[in-house]
Amino acid sequence: MNARINAEEIIRSIEAAHMKSDLPEIHVGDQVRVGVRIQEGGKERVQAFEGTVIAMRHSGCNRTITVRKIFQGIGVERVFLVHSPRIDSIQVLRRGKVRRAKLFYLRNRVGKATRIKAKTDSKEETL
């Protein structure tokens, strides 16, 4: 039993070394812009992917987010490993107000039906 606890602590310490600390708090329904480092030929550049977070999976350094956007009338989804060295930046553009953990129902919707209400901070309303 003691060896198992020790092994879990070792795994946690290794994962903690690979985790990024400068990431914003991300929730399902948020509108985000993810900067991804891509290599074209000999050059490396940052490509932005902007869309709605429709799912979050796993925890720790294995956390992934699924981001969906509509490009030229076609739905495009990408799964990003949040703590990957290929991810340059993640910006939350707008907070979304949703009541589901997974927004897969957005795949079946078109146009204005895919809109998500913006979350308003209760702190601002009381001031």
UniProtKB/Swiss-Prot annotation:
Taxonomy, superkingdom: Bacteria
Keyword Ribonucleoprotein applies: yes
Single GO term (MF): structural constituent of ribosome
Keywords attached to this entry: Ribonucleoprotein, Ribosomal protein
PROSITE patterns found in the cross-reference section: RIBOSOMAL_L19
Pfam families, per database record: Ribosomal_L19
GO cellular component terms, A-Z: cytosolic large ribosomal subunit
GO biological process: translation
Family membership noted in the UniProt record: Belongs to the bacterial ribosomal protein bL19 family.
Function of the molecule: This protein is located at the 30S-50S ribosomal subunit interface and may play a role in the structure and function of the aminoacyl-tRNA binding site.
PANTHER family reported for this sequence: LARGE RIBOSOMAL SUBUNIT PROTEIN BL19M, RIBOSOMAL PROTEIN L19
UniProt-listed InterPro entries: Ribosomal_bL19 (IPR001857), Ribosomal_bL19_CS (IPR018257), Ribosomal_bL19_sf (IPR038657), Translation_prot_SH3-like_sf (IPR008991)
HAMAP family assigned: Ribosomal_bL19
Gene symbol of the encoding locus: rplS
Protein name from the UniProt record: Large ribosomal subunit protein bL19
SUPFAM superfamilies associated with the record: Translation proteins SH3-like domain
Native source organism of the sequence: Synechococcus sp. (strain JA-3-3Ab) (Cyanobacteria bacterium Yellowstone A-Prime)
Presence of keyword Iron: no
